[in-house]
Amino acid sequence: MNSPVDRILIFDTTLRDGEQSPGATLTVEEKLSIARALARLGVDIIEAGFPFASPGDFEAVQKIAQTVGTENGPVICGLARATQKDIKAAAEALKPAAKHRIHTFLATSDIHLEHKLKKTRAEVLAIVPEMVAYAKSLVNDIEFSPEDAGRSDPEFLYQVLEAAISAGATTINIPDTVGYTTPAEYGALIKGIADNVPNIDQAIISVHGHNDLGLAVANFLEAVKNGARQLECTINGIGERAGNAALEELVMALHVRRSYFNPFLGRPADSTAPLTNIDTKHIYATSRLVSELTGMMVQPNKAIVGANAFAHESGIHQDGVLKNKLTYEIMDAESIGLTNNQIVLGKLSGRNAFGTRLKELGFDLSDTELNNAFIRFKEVADKRKEITDWDLEAIVNDEIRQPPELFRLERVQVSCGEPSVPTATLTIRTPAGPEETAVAIGTGPVDAVYKAINQIVQLPNELLEYSVTSVTEGIDALGKVSVRLRHNGVIYTGYAANTDIIVASARAYLGALNRLYAALEKSREHPPVVASL
C-alpha cells in the first residue's frame, strides 16, 4: 500500500464539513484564524472549503492557500463534485498553495444513484475516471470519495475505486456518510478494499465518518487496524447532524494507546515515535478557538476538551489523584495544553507583555488587531484588578474575531427594577451611515434591548438560545453572552464579552444579526451550492 507506514495522516475538514453545522457559518477572516491554528496544531491536510459553492467560499480557500499553504505548511485541499466546473474552480482557488489537493466525489450507493443522481452504475463507472483524470490534469494530488460507501455494494465499490486509482487518484476516501456502520462492519469494509482492489497499493486509504450513532471515532480506530492511513475529522467533532469524528479524540486515542496501535503500523509495540504529526499541546487552544468562532459550545463531559474531562467530584477519586494522578487519569491535562500556570496581567502591563502572552496562547494578530485588542485590554484592566488568560481569550475574540459591524452599537441605556417597567434606549449606526435611536419596553432589560434593536434592524428572526457565562470567578468578571437565532431555517450565532452584561447582550445579538444581514446580501448575488459526503 502506498501509505505513510510510519504514521497516520490527519485530514482536518472543520472548515468544510464542520462549517455545515447549523449556525457554524464563518467569515473569511475567521476561517483564516482557524486555518492558522490547524497549521500550528500540525494537521497534514486542511480541507479549506468548497470553492464552487459561492464566491465567499472561493475567496476563503484562495486566501488560506496564500497564507497557510506554505512549503513547510499543510496540504491545502478543496472539495469538488465530479463535474468539470467544480473541479476547475477548486484548482483555481488552490493555485497559491505550495502543496494542493482536489477532493472530488460521487455517490455509489444504490439509494443515492436512484433517488439523488438518477444515474445507473454504468454511468457512474464512466464519470468517475473521466473526472478524476480531468482533476489530475490540473493538480497532481487527487482524492476521490465514493459518497455513502458504507451502504454501497462492495463489489461495485471495488470497481469504482479501481477505476479512480487508474485515472490518477492518490487517496481513496471511504465515507460513512450517514453514520450507519458499526466498528466491525467498517473495519471489514476497509479490509475488503485493501484485499480486493487490485491497484490499492498505489493509493492511501482514507476514512470519513459521521457520528449519528456515536460510533465515528470507534469506526476510525478499527479502520486503522485494517489499513486506513488517513483520518478525516473535525475539531470538537462538529459537522452536519450529529457531527464528524472528533480530531482530539482520535489523536489522543492513538497517543495514549500507542503501544496497542503500533503493531498495526508495523512498529514494535514499545516504539515511542508519535503515530501522528499533531502537537497535542495545541489541542485545547484550537478547540476553544473553534468553539468561540462557530458559537458551538463544547459539552462539559466531552472527551479530551470538555470542562469536566479532568475534573474529579468523588472524594475517593480526589484522594487518589492527589496521591498519584495515574490512579484516575490516563493522560496529563498538560499534554493537550490545559494548564493552571496562568500569567496574570494588570492595568500597568505594557503592550509588549500583552502581545507576548497572546502569542504564547496561540494568537497570531496583525499590528492593527494587536493595537485594538490592547486598547480593549486596558479598558477591562481599569475595571478589574487582574486579567487572566481566560480574560485575554475573551477580549481578543470579542474585539477582533467579530463579523463586520454592518450595524454598530453606539450607545445603550436601560432602566429597570421593581416596580418600574424595563425600558431600553439605544443608538445604532446602520450600514447606510446614519445613526438611528429606538426605545422599547420588555419583560426584562435584555428583552427590552432586543426589541429596540429589532425596531432598527428589522430582520425577522426567531431567538433560539441566549446564554450568559462567567469567563472567570469574581463579581467583576467578564460575562460572555452567546446568542443563536434562526431566519428561514438557517441558524446564525453571535457572541460578545463585557463586564456589563447588557452591553455584551446587545453586541452578541447584533453580531448574529450582522452575520444574517451579510448572508442575505451574498445570497442575493450568488445562491449557495450545498455539498455532502
From Swiss-Prot:
One of its GO terms (biological process) is L-leucine biosynthetic process. Mn(2+) binds at D17, H208, H210, N244. Keywords: Amino-acid biosynthesis, Branched-chain amino acid biosynthesis, Cytoplasm, Leucine biosynthesis, Manganese, Metal-binding, Transferase. Its cofactor is Mn(2+). Residues 408-533 are annotated as: Regulatory domain. GO terms for cellular component: cytoplasm. SUPFAM superfamilies: 2-isopropylmalate synthase LeuA, allosteric (dimerisation) domain, Aldolase. InterPro entries: 2-IPM_HCS-like, 2-isopropylmalate_synth_dimer, AIPM/Hcit_synth_CS, Aldolase_TIM, LeuA/HCS_post-cat, LeuA_allosteric_dom_sf, LeuA_bact_synth, PYR_CT. PROSITE patterns: AIPM_HOMOCIT_SYNTH_1, AIPM_HOMOCIT_SYNTH_2, PYR_CT. It is found in: Cytoplasm. Pfam families: HCS_D2, HMGL-like, LeuA_dimer. Its EC number is 2.3.3.13. Pathway: Amino-acid biosynthesis; L-leucine biosynthesis; L-leucine from 3-methyl-2-oxobutanoate: step 1/4. Residues 8-269 form the Pyruvate carboxyltransferase domain. It comes from the Bacteria. One of its GO terms (molecular function) is 2-isopropylmalate synthase activity. HAMAP family: LeuA_type1. Homodimer. Catalyzes the condensation of the acetyl group of acetyl-CoA with 3-methyl-2-oxobutanoate (2-ketoisovalerate) to form 3-carboxy-3-hydroxy-4-methylpentanoate (2-isopropylmalate). Belongs to the alpha-IPM synthase/homocitrate synthase family. LeuA type 1 subfamily. NCBIfam families: leuA_bact (TIGR00973), PRK00915.1-3 (NF002086). This is 2-isopropylmalate synthase. It comes from Synechocystis sp. (strain ATCC 27184 / PCC 6803 / Kazusa).
